[in-house]
């Protein structure tokens, strides 16, 4: 794959586009929102600076071209990645529009956070070329990418996707079953559910919970995955503790009131200046810069 088109320039699009361009792909990008198209250049530049800090080889052949016209953006593409909002009908609509504009062998990849790929491809005319390509945020720093074949995805599409990801220096992980949330978000949301339950019960403050996780299990899991950690701790220890603890853990199927109350007030986090914590524009810039620096340092340490 040499020519990529990224559809959507919100949270994920700029970092994805910058990563692909850095790997030598010709990249075009599209967003229906003129404001996002205008702002995208800042995202490309910020991502490129981080990739330089990571010493990722710069194979860029040209700058990323931003379009306000979808057909112009996908012209000649052999890979199209959609990063539009998490709405099944919208994703299907986008792919249906693109199908009429690209060659038959162009791969259609979705960066959905958890909608089963089989459900997305079922609404398309050419489901065999539809595949999940779930990046983590920030996509230009976190190297793991989930590759999710739907029930109708052709094996060759999976192979091509894995090869393309490896050329970017990222790490492709093939998900064997197309379950909602795939793997990363199923694990993450299980952790989030328990964390929110502990805060709601008054067991711990949000600040102390963040410190506890970051400097406790988060610190370990950056180096040793959960299954390897079981072996290191001892399966007998897990069996003993899990025997009494598992039944005490949250198994709620709804979203915590702690979250719903805030979202109803449009307290959405960084994007609104208020969420769990309060943010000023200056604090947001400082937090994002610090996050990038620390994630770069962690990636370098793990790759050493």
Each language-model region and where it sits:
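NAD(P)+-binding Rossmann beta1-loop-alpha1 motif at the extreme N-terminus of oxidoreductases
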Residues: 1-50
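NAD(P)-dependent Rossmann-like dehydrogenase/reductase catalytic/cofactor-binding core
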Residues: 2, 23, 170, 201, ...
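Active-site-proximal catalytic alpha-helix in oxidoreductases
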Residues: 15, 139-148, 168, 173, ...
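Hydrophobic/aromatic beta-strand patches that form the interior of the parallel beta-sheet core
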Residues: 28, 67, 81, 131-133, ...
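Rossmann-like NAD(P)-binding element
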Residues: 32-35, 49-108, 115
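Helix N-cap / loop-to-helix initiation motif
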Residues: 33, 154, 204-208
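Rossmann-fold dinucleotide-binding core
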Residues: 107-185
């Amino acid at each position: 794959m040499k020519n990529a088109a990224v559809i959507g320039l919100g949270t994920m699009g700029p970092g994805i586009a910058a990563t692909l361009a850095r790997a030598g792909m010709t990249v075009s990008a599209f967003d229906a929102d003129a404001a996002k198209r205008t702002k995208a250049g800042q995202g490309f530049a910020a991502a490129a600076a981080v990739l330089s800090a990571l010493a990722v080889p710069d194979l860029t052949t040209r700058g990323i071209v931003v379009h306000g016209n979808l057909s112009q953006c996908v012209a000649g593409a052999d890979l199209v990645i959609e990063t539009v909002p998490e709405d099944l009908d919208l994703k299907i609509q986008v792919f249906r529009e693109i199908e009429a504009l690209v060659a038959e062998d162009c791969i259609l990849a979705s960066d959905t956070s958890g909608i089963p790929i089989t459900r997305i491809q079922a609404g398309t005319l050419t489901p065999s070329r539809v595949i999940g390509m779930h990046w983590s945020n920030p996509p230009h720093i976190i190297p793991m990418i989930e590759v999710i074949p739907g029930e109708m995805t052709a094996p060759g599409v999976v192979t091509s996707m894995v090869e393309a990801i490896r050329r970017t220096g990222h790490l492709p992980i093939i998900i064997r079953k197309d379950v909602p949330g795939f793997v990363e978000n199923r694990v993450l949301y299980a952790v989030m559910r328990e964390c929110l339950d502990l805060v709601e019960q008054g067991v711990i403050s949000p600040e102390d919970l963040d410190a506890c996780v970051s400097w406790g299990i988060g610190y370990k899991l950056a180096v040793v995955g959960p299954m390897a950690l079981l072996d290191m701790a001892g399966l007998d220890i897990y069996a003993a503790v899990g025997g009494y603890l598992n039944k005490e853990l949250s198994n709620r199927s709804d979203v915590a009131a702690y979250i719903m109350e805030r979202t109803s007030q449009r307290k959405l986090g960084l994007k609104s200046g208020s969420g769990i914590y309060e943010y000023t524009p200056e604090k947001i810039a400082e937090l994002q810069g610090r996050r990038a620096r620390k994630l770069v340092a962690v990636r370098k340490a793990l790759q050493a």
